[in-house]
Swiss-Prot record:
PANTHER family associated with the record: GLUTAMATE-1-SEMIALDEHYDE 2,1-AMINOMUTASE, GLUTAMATE-1-SEMIALDEHYDE 2,1-AMINOMUTASE 1, CHLOROPLASTIC-RELATED
Originating gene: hemL
GO biological process, one term: protoporphyrinogen IX biosynthetic process
Originating species: Pseudarthrobacter chlorophenolicus (strain ATCC 700700 / DSM 12829 / CIP 107037 / JCM 12360 / KCTC 9906 / NCIMB 13794 / A6)
Record's GO cellular component terms: cytoplasm
EC number: 5.4.3.8
UniProt lineage: Bacteria, Bacillati, Actinomycetota, Actinomycetes, Micrococcales
Top-level taxon of origin: Bacteria
Pathway where this protein functions: Porphyrin-containing compound metabolism; protoporphyrin-IX biosynthesis; 5-aminolevulinate from L-glutamyl-tRNA(Glu): step 2/2
Protein location: Cytoplasm
Record flagged with keyword Cytoplasm: yes
Name assigned to this protein: Glutamate-1-semialdehyde 2,1-aminomutase
NCBIfam families xrefs: hemL, PRK00062.1
Subunit structure: Homodimer.
Length: 443
């Protein structure tokens, strides 16, 4: 049991005097589930430890980067060696090219790569690049898809925006918002209509490879392929955001499981992709890449400006190289099996408690949506229409049993290569009580 949290409470009280809401990223405040956020002080393998000494099996995994488990020895060794050489040089380093080569080998759609520091910076640069390359202004995004907190893409965004039930963000000007067309996800007819009306001024369509920020939503059959065909027909670019799914859902990301798979019956290729999370191995780094002719529009070879003091930071590059080097196909196969085991156990527990639900998948990522078994979740409207009130009691029951879940129903669950039988059994043991708590919840 983890009900004793006096130190966490003290830390949160102090943090609220120093930082907006006491956090540096809104979802950490437990706003949609209530209670005291946990302040973590250490992590090892599949486990987290909070400031009160409570241990949790971790199903957040740093929102994806801890693919190998926390504090993996090879990653720590690489980071320690890099730190010994210096933290930042303001110049290029060998591991930038080493990491780029690994990404390009795994994702053949990437012909050039630019390192940045955050996923938001990657998508921001991709959008600017698309506008510069095409000479057009409008961007199509999909309701519920989250692409970081750049102004033009916050309308009807998922992730923390969905968690806080916000339509977008204050501070985004009408002029900026007017350059973004927000369409329903999984609706190719709406995309075709938008191009019929605005096609000559649409620079790009940006989409998550598989959305995981309104809960996990599987792209409908032919949806991503259709986006590729429509954009090419109209001279626009397709930007596929794999900040979350890249090298997390599979060896080559979600694109590698679908349109880029060797046995794909209907292959499709994005013009640009964005990456983050896993490629930094827990350190802050991200990247954008894609067609050489498009990427070469970036400075210094082209007129689209992008720069960053810490882009390609040597410590982050070392962590990324070590993580992807050890993220073998066997690692993904192992996580795939664990994901199926956990999702099956979750569904069985909810069924036994009489809780209507559906479980949504994107590779080894999944999430649960309550009250949706009849139709599943195909877009943002479906996600918002679920019985979200059942998640908070479910979450807190799991937390009390020592399992740390995402503190929002709109986020994916993550497993790692370090989740062994002992860790999985602790999760399985906690599920029946949590399912009963969800069943008893009143909306």
């Amino acid at each position: 049991m983890t009900s004793s949290t006096p130190r966490n409470e003290e830390l949160f009280d102090r943090a609220r005097q120093l930082m907006p809401g006491g956090v540096n990223s809104p979802v950490r405040a437990f706003g949609s589930v209530g209670g005291t956020p946990r302040f973590m002080v250490s992590a090892k393998g599949p486990y987290l430890m909070d400031a009160d000494g409570n241990e949790y099996v971790d199903l957040v995994c740093s929102w994806g980067p801890a693919l190998l488990g926390h504090a993996h020895p090879a990653v720590l060794d690489a980071v320690h060696a890099a730190v010994d050489r210096g933290l930042s040089f303001g110049a290029s380093t060998p591991d930038e090219a080493n990491l780029a080569e690994i990404v390009m080998e795994r994702v053949p759609a990437v012909e050039r790569l630019r390192m940045v520091s955050t996923g938001t910076e990657a998508t921001m640069t991709a959008v600017r690049l698309a506008r510069g390359f095409t000479g057009r202004n409008l961007i199509i995004k999909f309701a519920g898809c989250y692409h970081g907190h750049l102004d033009g893409l916050l309308a009807a965004a998922g992730s923390g925006v969905a968690t806080l039930a916000l339509p977008g963000s204050a501070g985004v000007t009408e002029a900026t918002a007017a350059e973004t067309l927000v369409l329903p996800y999984n609706d190719l007819a709406a995309v075709k209509e938008a191009f019929a009306t605005h096609g000559s001024n649409i620079a790009a369509v940006i989409t998550e490879a598989a959305p995981a920020n309104m809960g996990v939503v599987t792209p409908g059959e032919g949806f991503n392929l259709g986006l590729s065909r429509i954009t090419r027909e109209h001279g626009a670019l397709l930007i596929v955001d794999e900040v979350l799914t890249g090298f997390r859902t599979g060896y080559s990301g979600y694109w590698g499981l679908t349109g880029g798979a060797p046995d794909a019956t209907d292959p499709w290729t994005p013009d640009l992709l964005t990456f983050g999370k896993v490629i930094g191995g827990g350190m802050p780094t991200a990247a954008l890449g894609g067609r050489a002719d498009v990427m070469d529009y970036l400075a210094p070879t082209g007129p689209v400006y992008q720069a960053g003091t810490l882009s390609g930071n040597p410590v982050a590059m070392a962590a990324g190289v070590a993580t992807l080097t050890h993220a073998t196909r066997d690692v993904y196969s192992y996580i795939d099996v664990r994901s199926l085991e956990l999702s099956s156990a979750l569904s069985s527990a909810l069924d036994a408690a009489g809780v209507d639900h559906s479980i949504q998948f994107a590779g080894n990522l999944f999430s649960v949506a309550f009250g949706t078994s009849a139709h599943g979740v195909h877009n943002y409207a479906d996600a918002q229409g679920q019985e979200a009130f059942r998640y908070a009691p479910f979450f807190h029951s799991m937390l009390e049993s020592g399992v740390y879940l995402p503190p929002s129903v709109f986020e994916a669950w993550f497993l790692s290569a370090a989740h062994d039988d002992a860790a999985m059994n602790r999760i399985f043991d906690a599920l029946p009580a949590a399912a009963k708590a969800a069943a008893a919840a009143q909306g």
